[in-house]
Amino acid sequence: MSSHKIPESERFKGFANWVQYILARGLVSLLQILPIGLTYKMGRGAGWLSWKFMSKRRLVVRKNLEIINTWIQGQSANNGPPSDDAEEARKADSSSISSAKCNSPSGIRHYSSFPLETQIREVFQRAGANLFSGFTLSRMSPEQVEDYLQIEGLKYLDAALLQGKGVILLLAHMGPWEALNQLPVLASLHGIKVTFGAMYRPLNNTYFDNWLKTQREACGDRLFSRIDGFHKPVDFIRSGGMLGILADQKMREGPLASYFRVEVPTSPIPGLFHRRSGAPMLAMSFATVAPMRWKMTLTPVTYPAEVDLSSRAALALICNQALEQGLASSPCDGFWMHKRF
């Protein structure tokens, strides 16, 4: 029997997958209970080893960063030279954290001044630190999380929820995204009540996928995959929920839209859900601001009134532009190890 006729729930089972599941579950469970200082260092170490030995993946990261740098330099040219205050802020930031060379309080304009090889290594190390630390953050109490994760833009979430149509949250692969399940809890500390859901792609290991899904749902999250179809996630949004969608994934098909000045097939899902539900869209980004310290930023996604919302390409471009700004705010926190362009 050909593999495409076997249900995914059966195709990704078997002894080898079970062994992988036991190992992965053991690692995740360990990361959830270890001190975050240790998991952060372990993650950076794992990232360094990956950078050292994964030569083909380094080439992928290099190509992605070259495209991002070109885009950032173009934005920098449009914005003009940095002010004296911005330059002082950049120097202060660079001296306070050696592992966050890609960040700058003055925005994105200074990023490309660092050597490309330094950027490539930092992408690997931050990817490891963000992944490992994300599991630790996901199991902390809200009070503990606030010591490590700062949220900016909650006022935009509050304003969006007041419209009564739910919220669509545009996500990119960046930062400690496993900590996203803490967003509703942290928002509640500021008087904002919201249920969080997310679109997700099932893992190629049924055992680990089921366990990880149970873990996330135990935190109150609602998870939707392609087997849930179109209506369930839209109904969730309409009921007042906030649905997170990873919108920067590489697509085989989809409307072509500019992404860092490269025309790429783009996921139509955020735009389709926005058109169907009328829910406002917010974009979320992460930035490492110090060792074991992150900033999560929420920004409203806006577009001119004359935009044709019946056009999937127009909606895809709007979403890509929002993702560009978030990723460019801290490029080394982006997960650039997949062939996006």
Residue ranges and their predicted role:
Residues 147-150, 205, 223-226, 263-264, ...:
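A conditional alpha-helix N-cap/helix-loop micro-motif detector
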Residues 58, 202-206, 264-267:
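Active-site metal-coordination segments of metallo-dependent hydrolases
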Residues 2-88, 102-103, 107-168, 176, ...:
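Membrane-anchoring hydrophobic helices of lipid-metabolizing enzymes
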Residues 122, 130, 163-227, 252-255, ...:
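Catalytic core of membrane glycerolipid acyltransferases/transacylases, capturing the structured
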Residues 2, 6, 11, 50-53, ...:
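Non-catalytic C-terminal accessory region of glycerolipid acyltransferases
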Residues 69, 73, 164, 188-193, ...:
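Glycine-centered loop/turn motif at secondary-structure junctions
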